Structures are given as C-alpha cells and as structure tokens.
C-alpha cells in the first residue's frame, strides 16, 4: 500500500468500426497493460461495433506510466489476431483532479475541468473532456487505434482514492 497512489477505473464502453479479422466480422476483446498489470474485457462475438461496458480497475503506483490498450480478435483454433492498439497517459487527468480539489466543493454537475485536444502525441480521435459527473471527476475519450486500417475505442476514466495510499 505504501507505493499505491490510487485506483484507476477504466470503463471500456465500446468499439467503433473495428477491423474485420474473420470472414465477415470479428470477435473482439481488449487487453489493458500498465506496468506489470494486465486486464482484459470479455469477448463480444461477431461484431465490429462491440458494446463491452466492462469496468477494469488498475492499481496505480506510478502515474507517469503509459496505459496500453490492445484490441484482439478471439480465435478458437489459432492465435488471436491483433486488431490495433492505443496508448494514453493519465497525467492530464490527475492534474485536472488536483485542480478540481483546489477549487473546492460546490462545482456544478457537468463542469468541464479540462479539455484535451487530439495531437500527434496522443491517440485521441476527438477532444476529450474531464468533467464533474455526479460528484465524481471522469474523463471521456475516443482513442484511434494504431497499426490497423480502422477502428476506435470509447473509454471513461474514473479516479478512486484509497484510504492509506499516498494519494495524488
């Protein structure tokens, strides 16, 4: 616990226009890596527009480590096919949380705390807003998959403070 900063809940919402890796569709799932941690979503059969709505929770010990996301096509009889990957950093999200704490309570629901634009330094496909949503600070993002012909993944990040951790 002494190295734990907090928990990051990644709500993997959906994939959009993912690559076809089987005859006419794919059976996608996502693997998320951060440091030595590895988490994965469930497989959604026969879809290039899967709705996962899976929550994956990472223990954050170093907020400077990138979070890597890889989409795979599940295959029963052979190795799973890679369908693209993306990477993001939680530094801007943590900065926004610190800023919101400095502002104190009383911010109205829906307040945009920070806006992050797509750039060559990130995998965002559109502006990403960090907002106050029902008392929680969340970041919504669409990530454009790299090393593949098409596809995006929609995520929502939520920070969870853990009593006894270093905190942010």
Swiss-Prot record:
Q: Could you tell me in which tissues this protein is expressed? A: Expressed in roots.
Cofactor(s) needed, names only, are: Ca(2+)
Binding positions for Ca(2+) 1 per the UniProt entry: 21-22, 73, 75, 81
Looking at the Swiss-Prot or TrEMBL record, what is one Pfam family this protein matches? C2
- Give GO MF terms, alphabetically: calcium ion binding; GTPase activator activity; lipid binding; phospholipid binding; protein homodimerization activity
Q: Which residues lie in coiled coils? A: none
Q: Where in the cell is it found?
A: Cell membrane; Nucleus
Iron listed as a keyword: no
Effect of gene knockout: When associated with disruption in CAR4, CAR5 and CAR9 genes, reduced sensitivity to abscisic acid (ABA) during seedling establishment and root growth regulation.
GO cellular component, alphabetical, reads: nucleus; plasma membrane
Domain C2, which positions?
A: 1-104
Which keywords annotate this record?
Abscisic acid signaling pathway, Acetylation, Calcium, Cell membrane, GTPase activation, Lipid-binding, Membrane, Metal-binding, Nucleus
- Residues bearing N-acetylmethionine are 1
Which InterPro entries would you find in this protein's record?
Answer: C2_dom (IPR000008), C2_domain_sf (IPR035892), CAR1-11 (IPR044562)
The family database entries (CDD domains) matched by this protein are listed as: C2_ArfGAP
Q: Where does Ca(2+) 2 bind?
A: 22, 27, 73-75
Output one GO BP term. Answer: positive regulation of abscisic acid-activated signaling pathway
Q: Does the keyword Zinc-finger apply?
A: no
* Quaternary state and interactors: Dimers and oligomers. Binds to PYR/PYL/RCAR abscisic acid intracellular receptors in an ABA-independent manner, both at the plasma membrane and in the nucleus. Interacts directly with PYR1, PYL1, PYL4, PYL6 and PYL8. Binds phospholipids in a Ca(2+)-dependent manner.
Q: Which family does the similarity line name?
A: Belongs to the plant CAR protein family.
Q: What does this protein do?
A: Stimulates the GTPase/ATPase activities of Obg-like ATPases. Mediates the transient calcium-dependent interaction of PYR/PYL/RCAR abscisic acid (ABA) receptors with the plasma membrane and thus regulates ABA sensitivity. Binds liposomes in the absence of exogenous Ca(2+), but this activity is enhanced in the presence of Ca(2+) and generates membrane curvature.
Protein name in the entry:
Protein C2-DOMAIN ABA-RELATED 1
Identify the gene encoding this protein.
CAR1
């Amino acid at each position: 616990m002494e190295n734990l900063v907090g928990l990051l809940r990644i709500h993997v919402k959906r994939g959009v226009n993912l690559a076809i890796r089987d005859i006419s569709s794919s059976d996608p799932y996502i693997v998320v890596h951060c440091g030595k941690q590895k988490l994965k979503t469930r497989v959604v059969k026969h879809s290039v527009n899967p709705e996962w709505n899976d929550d994956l929770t990472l223990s954050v010990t170093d907020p400077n480590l990138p979070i890597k996301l890889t989409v795979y096509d599940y295959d029963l009889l052979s190795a799973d096919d890679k369908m693209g990957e993306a990477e993001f950093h939680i530094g801007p999200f943590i900065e926004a949380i610190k800023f919101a704490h400095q502002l104190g309570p009383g911010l109205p629901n829906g307040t945009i705390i920070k806006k992050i634009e797509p750039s060559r330094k990130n995998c965002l496909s559109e502006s990403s807003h960090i907002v106050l949503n029902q008392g929680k600070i969340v970041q919504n993002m669409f990530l454009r998959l790299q090393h593949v012909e098409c596809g995006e993944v929609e995520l929502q990040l939520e920070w969870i403070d853990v009593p006894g951790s270093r905190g942010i």
